[in-house]
């Protein structure tokens, strides 16, 4: 986060942890558990805290690339098997991937395989058009239920101006 003091950063970290745990009881979460036939009270969770590595560009901070790897690929293409896994890569924070946004996808067992698209037009229509950053400027007013209080979604043109798409 962009708090000036270590104490302020610590308090924002504690708020974020509380938000993650309480999110289990949000309506969307309860609806999801009802749909899959599980009792939300039996759910277990853990929190991993990791440093975001990147650079500051004006009032925004973001990594050039973030990724999510999964050991199981529900939609393998060409020679890939489900057990080969899948990787998604995106510019900026991993929220793009986690939220199901457009990202580059490939199978680690076959990294040179062509993408599973039939045309250049299909590739362009399935490409990332925005990215998430950490806002480093003005500290926003506290919002206990906002997951994006310190984040900003920007169009790729902004990253191009930052010089990160070369």
Language model segments and positions:
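Conserved mixed alpha/beta core segments that line enzyme active sites in large multi-domain catalysts
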Residues: 1-166
């Amino acid at each position: 986060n962009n708090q000036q003091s270590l104490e302020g950063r610590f308090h924002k970290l504690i708020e974020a942890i509380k938000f993650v745990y309480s999110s289990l009881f949000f309506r969307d979460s309860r609806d999801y558990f009802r749909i899959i036939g599980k009792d939300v009270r039996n759910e277990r969770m853990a929190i991993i805290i990791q440093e975001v590595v990147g650079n500051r560009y004006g009032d925004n901070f973001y990594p050039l690339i973030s990724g999510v790897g999964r050991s199981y690929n529900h939609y393998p293409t060409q020679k890939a098997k489900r057990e080969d896994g899948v990787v998604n890569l995106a510019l900026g924070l991993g929220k793009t991937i986690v939220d199901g946004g457009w990202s580059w996808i490939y199978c680690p067992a076959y990294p040179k395989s062509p993408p599973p698209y039939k045309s250049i037009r299909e590739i362009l229509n399935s490409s990332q058009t925005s990215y998430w950053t950490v806002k480093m400027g003005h500290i926003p007013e506290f919002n206990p239920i906002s997951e994006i209080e310190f984040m900003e979604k920007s169009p790729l043109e902004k990253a191009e101006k930052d010089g990160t798409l070369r």
